[in-house]
Amino acid sequence: MLISRPVPISNHLCFVRKFVSISCAALALIVELAAAPRGAYARATPQFEALPLVRSRQNHLLVRAFINGKPAWLTVDSGAPVSVIALNRREYFRLKPTTAESKLPARVQINGAFNSVVIARELRIGGLTLVDEPVVTVDLGYSTRAARHVHEQEIDGIIGADILFPTQAVLDCERQLLILKTDPEVMGRVPGFDRRGLRAVPIQVSDDYNLYVNGSVNGKPAKLMVDTGSFATLLHRSFVRRMRIATRETQFSSSAVNLKERGVRVALIRKLSVGSVDIFGKEVGVIDLEGLIHDGLLEPRDGGAPVAGLLGAETLRRHHGIIDFGTRTLYLR
């Protein structure tokens, strides 16, 4: 997992991007998390629970949680395959290492560095209580410094796809709500979910639990990763160059764990399409995503469209984005 330091863009707020690359060992952890029974539940009703989220000045959506009885602020991040806890909070939350009986790896390699897998005896999010929940400890120092820079609450960790998919979560980016299924036996969709006026965009889920949607940039077919952990929509520098789209330099740069600092430019996209939703005159960040999106997805292959960048929180909020992890659908207006 990689986290960029704060980089102001056009509105002078900060964004923090957590870029994730997972080795085979980490992928094994994701498979274990997806297949494992999802712990115990604090109460049988309601079968679904809508939790209010707090939007940080870095444009992240935060939910209040309790880890082993201690309060925590966790970022809800659709771009994170696994849930993580800040390394410097491991002792505070009394997280324990994995055991041989658990059949989980003790460490996973993420972008060339090893991170420990630990167990939270109890992770409570609203009425949902997960017992003996595996999480990865990661240095979130970049995020911590970003929070201090804008004088706001530091985050304790991240809720990733390993929790969002099994609970068939619905994340409403505009209304700032996280809806979780607290009873895994309940069938059917989230009640009271109004889709009127919204357009459905199918989500493709990769083997390492990243979410992609089809779209286009100035008419050129491209895929975008749906990433609420990215403050703004960001396009890959090489893709923008191939499209001969003009960019302008900024004084800002982005750094990430185990990667060199990278400059950030800004481009004006004439037409950005996500599914059947067209966005005209869209200003986006431009950054080198090499090493952050892997498996050759940044380059077109076998006639398929490349991954051009990240569909970030600012765009999702402005266009009433709703991510339905149960049906694997993104709704936009």
Question: Where are the language model's segments positioned?
Answer:
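Residue-level detector of alpha-helical transmembrane segments in integral membrane proteins
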Residues: 1-3, 30, 39
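N-terminal secretory signal peptides that target proteins for export/translocation
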Residues: 1-17
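Sequence-pattern detector for short linear motifs
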Residues: 8, 20-21, 92
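Bacterial N-terminal signal peptides
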Residues: 21-32
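Pepsin/retropepsin-fold aspartyl endopeptidases
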Residues: 33-333
